[in-house]
Amino acid sequence: YSDVTHEYVMHKASQVLALGADFRLMGTHSTQIKSQRPVVSVCAVRTGSGKSQTSRQVVDILQAMGQRVVAVRHPMPYGNLIAQSVQRFAEYDDLDEYECTIEEREEYEPYIDRRAVIYAGVDYEAILRKAETEADIVVWDGGNNDLPFYQPDLHIVVVDPHRAGHELSYHPGEANLRAANVVIINKVDTADYANVLKVRANIQAVNPGALVLEAASPLTVAHPEAIRGKRVLVIEDGPTLTHGEMAYGAGVVAAQRFGAAELIDPRP
């Protein structure tokens, strides 16, 4: 289970137990693979908290230090899973070779633009062994609010003050928070600061030893003048609004910030 409430998980457990079967929650000792290289993992307490931008910043910092960095992305398994067992992306042609979806491309292209290699696929032990051959450091770019597949040497977890309280009420996000070495409170430039303080207090309650950082998540728009005074139809990031349960995303914030006259309701 991923990005669901604790209550949801236990209702499912109750259904299973009532039928006489066991319900098991597997921990990191059972599910994480040990790398021969140092691993920095970037995960979150909810979908849409800002993992990808954080992962890319980590890659930028490590590259500036002269490290060979290879990223590994949490799986997005579409299409032929056998053919997608191990995927390596270093050039734009690789995206065509693996027939990547738009969702996959928006995750991989920023790494290619940085001249960084990113792996993904299905067999994550085979992926790791390939990545280790060309990396000084492996960066795990997590998905949803899942735990990292690789045993991290530094575990960074991103929290979202727009959903204050969710860091303690969603699975497996709370486990990520409790295991974190570094917690980043993201989006402080757009959040109510009372919610930032609430999140900070919750972090202190369950993981007082973690290093806590506050981060802005500034929006950039290629042609902001095209928005001002216009009626705008916003197409948001899907997961953030669906299982992420946000009422709005960066698109709405950008439209409002850059002077949209009206947000169009697309419903018939």
Map each language-model feature to its residues:
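Pre-Walker A adenine-sensing motif
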Residues: 25-34
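Flexible phosphate-sensing "switch/lid" loops adjacent to ATP/NTP-binding sites
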Residues: 1-7, 15, 31, 39-44, ...
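Conserved glycine(s) of the Walker
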Residues: 49-50
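N-terminal pre-Walker A segment at the start of P-loop NTPase domains
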Residues: 17-24
